[in-house]
Amino acid sequence: MEFILSLIGSLLLIICVLVSVAFLTLLERKVLGYIQIRKGPNKVGLMGIPQPFCDAIKLFTKEQTYPLLSNYLSYYISPIFSLFLSLFVWMCMPFFVKLNSFNLGGLFFLCCTSLGVYTVMVAGWSSNSNYALLGGLRAVAQTISYEVSLALIGFKILLFSLL
């Protein structure tokens, strides 16, 4: 029974994160519309609130294209795996209700974020383009350098909280 409640809580958390991202993109489009002295997205529904869902429907119904010489499976799996990793990181966040409470949440966070590097590298490699591979390697180098500084800042906070 506890496993089912944990699974339902995790699914509810993922759905809430995805909906909040959709409305943050709507907020971004509204702010950009006001900055550029136009109304922004307001054609769908009441004040454009269903606009992110209409954008998602439009995105999923578009034709899928891929480079001819690419590795088809890894070309499509790597962004999906990256999305799952970013949603999986939310499982270690402490909440008022104990969803998945474990002691090594900080280490789990660092491990999940470091796995995201591989998805970028595989996405660049699987397109069989030298330019995409170089762009993927640059993104990997940048991500690794950011992760090192993030880990050092996290360890510093942990060290000062123990004193």
Swiss-Prot record:
GO terms for biological process: aerobic respiration. Keywords: Electron transport, Membrane, Mitochondrion, Mitochondrion inner membrane, NAD, Respiratory chain, Translocase, Transmembrane, Transmembrane helix, Transport, Ubiquinone. GO terms for molecular function: NADH dehydrogenase (ubiquinone) activity. Its EC number is 7.1.1.2. PROSITE patterns: COMPLEX1_ND1_1. It is an enzyme of class 7 (translocase). It is found in: Mitochondrion inner membrane. It catalyses: a ubiquinone + NADH + 5 H(+)(in) = a ubiquinol + NAD(+) + 4 H(+)(out). Belongs to the complex I subunit 1 family. Core subunit of the mitochondrial membrane respiratory chain NADH dehydrogenase (Complex I) that is believed to belong to the minimal assembly required for catalysis. Complex I functions in the transfer of electrons from NADH to the respiratory chain. The immediate electron acceptor for the enzyme is believed to be ubiquinone. This is NADH-ubiquinone oxidoreductase chain 1. It comes from Drosophila guanche (Fruit fly). The gene is mt:ND1.
